[in-house]
Structures are given as C-alpha cells and as structure tokens.
C-alpha cells in the first residue's frame, strides 16, 4: 500500500500504516498533481487509486472526462463511482432537483444567491457553494441585513456559485452507504452526530438503525448509480416522526467512517469488494452505540530517522520512505 499526503511523513501518524509514503503536491495545482500520480503509479507499479478527499476527486473527475486520452496514461483503475454519479454528487443543486423529481426523500429546495437580490424571503437561511466541501464558504443568514452583507461582499460570479436554502434545525445524520451493483447489495449504517468540528467532522456520535432512512439511502444510491462506499448527510428535523431532510452525498469515505468500523462493519473492506467482484458481508449491527473519538500523541522521532535514511527524490519532488518492521501506531 502506497500512501500520500501533502505533509512530510514525520508530521503524519498514518504514514506508519502504509508500506511506502510520498509527500504529494497540492491537488489544487491540477496539472502538477496529475503528473505526480502518473509518475507515482509507474514507479510503484500501482494498479489502483483510491482518492479520499473532494479536491482529489475533482481532479480525477476532470481528468477522466475532459482529458480522457491523458487519463489512459495513468494505467491504473480508480476505485470510485462512475463519472456521471460523481458529477451529480458534487453539485448540491442538481442533486436536490434529481431527488425531488423522483420523490426519493425529503429535500431542501434552494435558489442561487443572485436571485435573492429582488426576492423577499423568510429567515434563517443557509448559503453555501453548490460544489463546496467541508463547510467551506458556509454562511448562516439570520436577517435581511446578513443577506445584504453577503450580496455586497460577493462578486457576480460568486453570487451564481452560492446556493441558498431554508435553515432546518436538528441533528446532522451521517449515513455510510456501500453499494455493489453486480450483487445488488446495499448496506447502510447511520449515525447521529452529537459533537462535530466547525468543518463538519463528527467527534461524538450515536450509531443507530432506522429502516425508513436506510431504505431512502438505498433508493438514492441505486438511482444515482453509486459504486462502493459513499457518505450521505441528512438533517433530523423530528426523530419521532422519522423526518429527515437530505443535505448531500459525498462520493467518498466520510471522515468518520471509522465509527462504522467501531460499531462492527468494515466499510473499507466492503468498498474494495465492490470493485473486486466479491459479495459484501451482511451488516449485523443492532441497537444504539455511543462512540466518541479521541486524539493521542505519538513520538515520531524514530520515523524521522527512517525518513531521512530512506528519503529519495522523485521527478515531482515527493519523498518516499520504506516502512520499518518495528513501526507501529
């Protein structure tokens, strides 16, 4: 297993979990990042890529749709949903319309920010980029004054990029959903986020089962054409009435996918099976489980020495390091 991160190995504890580690360039520099991946796959004879962040997925999505001939030079499979499914997932506006028209679940209709300049509306509202990630650019508008301020500070182009929706109060519900199109299997495991960071990562959750919500997720995954593991988010407006409003589908692992593993279902293994033709394990998690995340400190000094001793230069200025036999975390 070859791992990549934008930071040096000695800064990243998980660099100990892979056989070889490379420091990658920022994916926002798309051409440089594409060249990095091509060189890396060739050097390490990697036959599979598994992108884990939205910005990486956006690069690969453009690569395989707009630069198809160059993408073939990668000579590796990308274990990700098909381009059409990813395109829909990465556009919150199109996804909401897609689900609403098919009546698959409750959605929150919205309008572009530019349209609100001449409209009267009720508050509070939520404004967010239609292709945003990790709550970046998210704004809560409590009044007309908040709206006027946002309109004043946004360019005309930015006004077209913002989607504005009514704000619905409630817990954020995250559902890990894995679909194997060949076997027809779809497994879903929801969790209620009790504490979360400002960029939307849950730190204390309650894993639970809900037949109605899980069926909605199965219907969505099938309609969109999902393959592998994705993460769907909802607002739980009323727990007793099973009132859930769809927020988005991230076409990747959730940052909190380990919560599903802790509850008893290995989503990473299930994702791999969706691309290797194997059947998924049955999901046997029952009841409620409260699971909290904590951080621990690790000394990386021994890894520093290994990194220096094993450091090599690649054509894309990455560093690689063989994993020591005694490395552990």
Residue ranges and their predicted role:
Residues 40-46, 120-121, 157-158, 240:
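Glycine-rich phosphate-binding loop signature in dinucleotide/nucleotide-binding domains
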């Amino acid at each position: 297993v070859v791992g990549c991160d934008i930071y040096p190995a000695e800064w990243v504890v998980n660099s100990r979990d892979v056989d070889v580690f490379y420091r990658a360039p920022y994916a926002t520099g798309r051409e440089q990042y594409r060249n990095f991946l091509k060189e890396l796959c060739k050097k390490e004879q990697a036959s599979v890529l598994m992108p884990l962040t939205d910005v990486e997925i956006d690069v690969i999505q453009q690569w395989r749709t707009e630069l198809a001939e160059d993408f073939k030079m990668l000579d590796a499979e990308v274990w990700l949903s098909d381009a059409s499914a990813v395109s829909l997932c990465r556009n919150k506006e199109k996804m909401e319309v897609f689900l609403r028209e098919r009546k698959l679940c409750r959605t929150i209709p919205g309008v572009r920010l530019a349209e609100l300049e001449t409209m009267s509306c009720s508050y509070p509202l939520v404004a967010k980029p239609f292709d945003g990630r990790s709550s970046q650019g998210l704004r809560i508008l409590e009044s007309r004054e908040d709206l006027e301020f946002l309109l004043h500070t946004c360019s005309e182009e930015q006004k077209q990029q913002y989607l504005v929706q009514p704000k619905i109060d409630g817990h954020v519900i995250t559902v890990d959903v894995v679909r194997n199109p060949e076997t027809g299997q779809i497994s879903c495991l929801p969790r209620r986020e009790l504490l979360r960071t400002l960029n939307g990562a849950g730190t204390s959750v309650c894993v639970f089962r809900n037949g109605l919500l899980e069926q909605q997720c199965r219907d969505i995954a099938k309609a969109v054409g999902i393959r592998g593991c994705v993460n769907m988010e909802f607002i739980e407006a009323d727990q007793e009435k099973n009132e859930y409003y769809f927020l988005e589908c991230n076409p990747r692992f959730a940052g909190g996918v380990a919560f599903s593993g802790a509850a008893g279902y290995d989503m990473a293994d299930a994702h791999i099976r969706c691309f290797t033709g194997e059947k998924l394990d049955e999901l046997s998690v029952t009841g409620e489980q409260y699971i909290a995340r904590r951080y621990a400190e690790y000394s990386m000094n021994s890894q520093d020495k290994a990194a220096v001793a094993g450091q090599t230069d690649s054509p894309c200025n990455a560093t690689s390091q063989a994993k020591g036999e005694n490395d552990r975390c």
